[in-house]
């Protein structure tokens, strides 16, 4: 059955060439990202439990979690937690199948705690955390739509859409690379840098200004001068990384709210502001490509925690992202592409109501030169859409 794939010219200036561009990333320890990460870890754990017990994934969605901030008293050399962080695991899960009970709550609690250990190593889960699981069961109609049939493509759980774009602009590359560098290279050497980091970028013409807010872990900071040195070190390292991503002028500022007195610094006990006053929710942070991009098309769906079998809010956002970048990598002549996939509830997920590609061609190219190759990439991606499910379950695709 042929698919409704449309390709047209987008008559606008590429974002990279516009005068103003804003981009944001909330890194792993930001409360909103903590909520996203827990939601996805719980979903993945449930998927594997269902597969182990029954040979296939059962209905669930764990995309409703909340982080409620605690209270802390950080100080140079190490402070203390006064009130624990509260984590609520919310959503839907299958807890019984063919008369057999499933320990869904137990699986969810373990997955959430295991995830927190990896991203918040300074957090004592026994003393600094309260976690409650309130997973319910799904509505009958959506569970019926979910039911897989042997050899059949899953049916969409909703009438919804996924959207993405490519390629990344210079400032988007800068922010993604700085975040990755801090996680993989800088923090292992300097554990003072907590995982709660937000990077906000402004490109105005040919100048990029990056504002980084980084939670410092107090037990690794002995004094104000020590703190200032670490702050300056982070700015220097971020600038080095940014210069590998762009030829534009780059300015980096770190913790600009600091007053350089002990009581007015971004100093934390655990490396996250969730310990004191900053709550988090699933879906309030990064989109599926890891960024918040107000100059780009975005979906408001929370990708993390949704089931990877037929939940369009997850599958179409991840797939549209892959399709857009694949088109740019494999097809000459694309300055910018936007891909949108729209489902119709109950229809096979490989047959969207429409798959739309809007293209800004490079000079000397036309959409007619490009459209056949783009069509084939989108058609092939939809034909193999269930590979998204498989890679999500294996943890190979990032959702935030």
Curated annotation (Swiss-Prot):
It catalyses: L-methionine + ATP + H2O = S-adenosyl-L-methionine + phosphate + diphosphate. The keyword Nucleotide-binding applies. Its cofactor is Mg(2+). One of its GO terms (molecular function) is ATP binding. Gene3D superfamilies: 3.30.300.10, S-adenosylmethionine synthetase, C-terminal domain. Keywords: ATP-binding, Magnesium, Nucleotide-binding, One-carbon metabolism, Transferase. GO terms for biological process: one-carbon metabolic process; S-adenosylmethionine biosynthetic process. Its EC number is 2.5.1.6. It is an enzyme of class 2 (transferase). Pathway: Amino-acid biosynthesis; S-adenosyl-L-methionine biosynthesis; S-adenosyl-L-methionine from L-methionine: step 1/1. The keyword Transferase applies. ATP binds at residues 136-141. HAMAP family: S_AdoMet_synth2 (MF_00136). Belongs to the AdoMet synthase 2 family. Catalyzes the formation of S-adenosylmethionine from methionine and ATP. This is S-adenosylmethionine synthase. It comes from Methanospirillum hungatei JF-1 (strain ATCC 27890 / DSM 864 / NBRC 100397 / JF-1). The gene is mat.
